[in-house]
């Protein structure tokens, strides 16, 4: 949900989302951080490649200003059927994910989470704004502006050079 102002959100920092435990998280806490925002799923063919690479990127760059924000989504092939507790256990136990995992959201349609409406309007995809599948990635700069959007099949490791540019270690 956007902040209480009637203005259009100007950055990702203008949103409040729910974490996996149902608590409000004001995304302004990430001001000054580079964000990689990903819609994740536990039972997708891309899961076994994406989660380990996301974890590696996070371990490598979290102290340099990177945060990875994972939003579970069940809109693609019902590949995220579990509840938030099951999703967190899966990601944190199987893949040792230490990055924040948020409440399950819709990324498309009339019930799409406002933060995803903003991401899509900032960086449309090759075939329009809609998210096509799990593990679509958005790279956001330290000011909360969407810099790039990556297809589900783009590996997190291949985004490393873009992350390094934004955090200033290229």
Swiss-Prot record:
The active site is at residue 44. The keyword Transferase does not apply. PROSITE patterns: GLUTATHIONE_PEROXID_1, GLUTATHIONE_PEROXID_2, GLUTATHIONE_PEROXID_3. It holds the Pfam family GSHPx. It is an enzyme of class 1 (oxidoreductase). One of its GO terms (molecular function) is phospholipid-hydroperoxide glutathione peroxidase activity. Its main location: cytoplasm. It is found in: Cytoplasm. Keywords: Cytoplasm, Oxidoreductase, Peroxidase. Transmembrane segments: none annotated. Protects cells and enzymes from oxidative damage, by catalyzing the reduction of hydrogen peroxide, lipid peroxides and organic hydroperoxide, by glutathione. This is Probable phospholipid hydroperoxide glutathione peroxidase. It comes from Mesembryanthemum crystallinum.
């Amino acid at each position: 949900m956007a902040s209480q102002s009637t203005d259009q959100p100007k950055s990702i920092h203008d949103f409040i989302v729910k974490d996996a435990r149902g608590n409000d998280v004001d995304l302004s806490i990430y001001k000054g951080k580079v964000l990689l925002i990903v819609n994740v799923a536990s039972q997708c063919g891309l899961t076994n490649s994406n989660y380990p690479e996301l974890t590696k990127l996070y371990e490598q760059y979290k102290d340099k200003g990177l945060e990875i924000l994972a939003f579970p989504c069940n809109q693609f092939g019902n590949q995220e059927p579990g509840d938030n507790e099951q999703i967190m256990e899966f990601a944190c136990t199987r893949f040792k994910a230490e990055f924040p995992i948020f409440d399950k959201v819709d990324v498309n349609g009339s019930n799409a989470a406002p933060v995803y409406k903003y991401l899509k309007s900032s960086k449309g995809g090759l075939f329009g704004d809609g998210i096509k599948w799990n593990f679509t990635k958005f790279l956001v700069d330290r000011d909360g502006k969407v810099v790039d959007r990556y297809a589900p099949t783009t590996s997190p490791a291949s985004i490393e050079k873009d992350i390094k540019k934004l955090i200033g270690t290229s």
